[in-house]
């Protein structure tokens, strides 16, 4: 799970130093890569310096951004990444002034950029949260969901909007404006779309209610979420009381058994429900600008209607059907297409799976990864860990989020990034540029590193690179210094300060900011296997191994 505490680093190498050469790297058998947290919070009590993008001169060769590792000479500044000499702008000419400029003051700073018209249109203003709950779960599942939703509501601002949807073989949309929460339902067909869109059951503006104003109604609706057997037991108890009064003359009491349908095989049209919610969110009236986030809770495979999944089976040696090996390859494109639709409409979809049985992560995962959401899986082998669900939901909604991000890593010429892992989408036009739909302070992405043509960080005489070695710095005698620069462009809304009595204050849009975060770091060079092993960073190595294993299992989406 992502970290909850602010971290002070944004680029972490798999070791304290880079391997000297290809031969050394291969002899150790260690992975070589890095993990970046582009939106990580700075150390508590500090802020990143900000400078206007118009005031910063980029390298004319590799387009890297100026940083604290750059060197200066007469009328020129040298790029710390590629060593290129660049024209000295007037802003950089005075040495005393240079030291105070944000881009040279430390290893990390931000460029302030002007949001475009497209940014304003696609980035919603008012936070709106829609909970989609699998109503077919057992008592343990529903108890966890009630606790998780209570935690979610407590993490929201009083002016945020909230809606509640349940799904079994019917979709239930709650009217949270009533004194007693009412549910309006529509059946999920076995195939095709709903007979009645959710908008006709309850318009979007009425389904979404303000958290602070309707807190009691929201709490009552959450408390009403019961498992089928719990609801059947309550109905049976009520029927028993009625039967006792009706049969007083017979002198015997009749106990009403729980209906068979209450304990029958679960049916849940999850895919149809999320699709219907996405359609409902698309009916926002003119002038309303929402930043929607769907919080889904699932107790097992969605097995009814659009997006239904089945347990994966294969033919055994005896010809009988048996469960196949778990796979992360999608069995259907439904959730991938739905995730792309969410991304197009600025909707983030989170999914919490709390299941006693296996689930088809390969099919469900794209809904989250493509929309910028997160997927949490709580398996039966670790049932004691289920208690963390409410806290996990609270943490996820409490973190700051960046949207519409673009991420690039630039490296010095001896090495390069070879693979990227995480919720990243490669740009179709520019190499090594990745799109990040959404991320928070704890989101991390992994990159494999590899040597380029040089195959070593050693600087040999006669190579023609001696002068560059001096400009680029030296890890030790005769070695070139490895450097990485991260550039992360994102949009976010500034957190508005709360005046006294904020619970009753009407909502006001927070200003949209667009920033480009730049961090440049350099590393030592390890010359022996002993230095490589001594400097290992286990958590980074483990992440690189895990994501590499996943990549060999799933289809790239």
Model-found features: residue ranges?
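Extended acidic, low-complexity intrinsically disordered regions
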Residues: 1-557
């Amino acid at each position: 799970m992502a970290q909850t505490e602010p971290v002070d680093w944004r680029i972490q190498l798999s070791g304290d130093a880079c391997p000297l050469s290809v031969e050394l790297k291969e002899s150790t058998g260690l992975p070589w890569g890095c993990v970046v947290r582009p939106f990580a919070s700075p150390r508590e009590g500090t802020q990143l310096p900000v400078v206007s993008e118009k005031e910063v001169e980029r390298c004319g060769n590799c387009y890297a951004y100026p940083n604290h590792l750059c060197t200066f000479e007469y009328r020129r500044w040298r790029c710390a990444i590629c060593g290129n000499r660049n024209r000295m702008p007037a802003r950089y000419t005075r040495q005393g002034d240079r030291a105070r400029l944000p881009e040279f003051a430390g290893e990390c700073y931000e460029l302030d950029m002007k949001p475009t018209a497209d940014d304003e249109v696609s980035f919603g203003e008012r936070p709106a949260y829609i909970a989609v709950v699998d109503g077919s779960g057992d008592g343990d599942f529903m108890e966890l969901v009630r606790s998780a939703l209570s935690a979610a509501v407590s993490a929201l601002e009083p002016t945020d909007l909230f809606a509640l949807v349940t799904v079994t073989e019917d979709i239930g949309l709650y009217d949270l404006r009533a004194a007693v929460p009412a549910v309006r339902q529509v059946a999920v067909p076995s195939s095709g779309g709903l007979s009645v869109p959710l908008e006709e059951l309850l318009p979007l503006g009425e389904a979404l209610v303000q958290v602070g104003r309707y807190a009691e109604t929201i709490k009552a609706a959450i408390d009403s979420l019961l498992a089928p057997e719990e609801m059947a037991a309550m109905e049976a108890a009520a029927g028993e009381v009625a039967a006792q009064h009706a049969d007083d003359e017979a002198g015997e009491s009749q106990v009403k058994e729980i209906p068979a349908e209450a304990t029958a095989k679960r049916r849940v049209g999850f895919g149809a429900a999320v699709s219907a919610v996405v359609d409902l969110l698309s009916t926002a009236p003119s002038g309303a600008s929402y930043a929607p986030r769907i919080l889904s809770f699932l107790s097992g495979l969605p097995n009814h209607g659009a997006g239904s999944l089945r347990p994966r089976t294969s033919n055994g040696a005896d010809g009988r059907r048996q469960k196949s090996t778990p796979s992360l390859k999608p069995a259907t494109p439904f959730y991938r297409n739905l995730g792309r639709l969410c991304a197009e409409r600025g909707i983030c979809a989170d999914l919490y799976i709390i299941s006693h049985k296996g689930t088809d992560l390969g099919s469900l995962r794209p809904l989250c990864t493509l929309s910028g959401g997160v997927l949490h899986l709580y398996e039966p082998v670790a049932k004691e860990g289920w208690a963390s669900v409410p806290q996990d939901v609270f943490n996820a909604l409490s973190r700051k989020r960046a949207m519409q991000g673009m991420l690039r890593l630039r490296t010095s010429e001896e090495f390069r990034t070879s693979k990227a892992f995480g919720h990243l989408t490669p740009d179709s036009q520019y190499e090594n540029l990745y799109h990040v739909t959404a991320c928070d302070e704890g989101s991390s992405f992994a990159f494999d590193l590899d040597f380029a043509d040089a195959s070593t960080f050693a600087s040999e005489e006669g190579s023609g690179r001696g002068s560059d070695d001096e400009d680029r710095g030296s890890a030790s005698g005769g070695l070139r210094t490895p450097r990485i620069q991260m550039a992360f462009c994102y949009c976010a809304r500034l957190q508005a300060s709360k005046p006294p009595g904020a619970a009753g204050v009407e909502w006001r849009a927070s200003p949209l900011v667009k920033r480009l975060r730049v961090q440049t770091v350099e590393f030592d060079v390890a010359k022996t296997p002993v230095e490589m092993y001594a400097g290992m960073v286990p958590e980074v190595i483990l992440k690189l191994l895990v994501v590499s294993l996943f990549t060999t299992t799933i289809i790239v989406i």
